[in-house]
Amino acid sequence: NLLHKLNIMAGLRADYSSEYGIFLTPRVHAKWEIIHGLTWRASAGKGYRTPMPLAENNFMLASSRKMVIPDRLKQEEAINVGTSLNALIPLGEREVSLTVDFYRTNFLEQVVRDVDSSTDKVVFSDLEGTSFSNAFQAELLYEIFKGFTVNAAYRSNVVKQTISGQLREMPLTSRYKGLLSMSYATRMKKWQFDLTSQFNGGGRMPDPDALNPLWSTEFKPFTVVNAQVTKNFKRWSFYAGAENLLNFMMDNPVIGAADPWGKDFDGTMIWGPVHGRKIYAGLRFTINDYN
């Protein structure tokens, strides 16, 4: 009977806040092993969060923008649902692990950080309209031959929020991300070789001043590649590697950097690497080996 392998767990949590009173947080999880090597999971629930706009957005102080925060903001409230399917697929003498996920968060109440209406201030307010986040991810893991593993993943992000009466993409949020990593370990793990590529999609920038645009309306996709080689001894490990091998950097990460006290200064428009290629080397010493 397939239903014998279906597990469902539900819960309900009650909280009391001196500011917001009593609120309930329901949650349900399900897991179903449909057949051997094919597992389905799902979850749904409701969540609350007390906003602290200044503490959570203190990075905005690295700009000349004035922060406008009302005396009282509503407690954030969201419904989240998600599902995933994991399959173990025989391929040769090994198995490919394939996982597909989809998660959605729908905000009923949310604090909106508006950096679009004006370039000289950031305005915090309660949500008036729709706000949601959809995330789809697929991941593949496979050991091609003994010691050599490949991991590939792709994630699509659709994050939108009502800002000044318009449903728009959240600024400075990549529309997609990708990962490709390869790892090879020799016999007895005497040598370890790792190569990782991170793919970052483009996205929307906060609206620039229409009369004096100091940045683009979009940021472009970019790729970051890291590599490392490790030589292992009984207690010592020597390693060397490089970060950001392609040496990709933002052209002008800080707006108005020449005049930090000017009205155009803004160090919050960071969407990519601000440091170039880095070469490093080091060693590790293991005091206790529990293996």
What are the functions of these language-model segments?
Residues 4-8, 97-106, 126-208, 284-291:
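Gram-negative outer-membrane beta-barrel transporters
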Residues 39-88, 202-206:
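Outer-membrane beta-barrel translocator/channel fold
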Residues 12-18, 44-50, 57-59, 87-89, ...:
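Transmembrane beta-strands of outer-membrane beta-barrel pores
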Residues 20-26, 53-59, 66, 110-119, ...:
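Outer-membrane beta-barrel translocator domains and adjoining extracellular loop/strand segments
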Residues 12, 24-30, 69, 79-83, ...:
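Hydrophobic, lipid-facing positions within transmembrane beta-strands of outer-membrane proteins
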Residues 150, 187, 199-206, 230-291:
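C-terminal beta-signal and adjacent terminal beta-strands/loops
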Residues 33, 39-41, 74-126, 132:
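Membrane-embedded beta-barrel scaffold of Gram-negative outer-membrane proteins
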Residues 1-4, 14, 22, 32-33, ...:
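Residue-level signature of outer-membrane beta-barrel architecture
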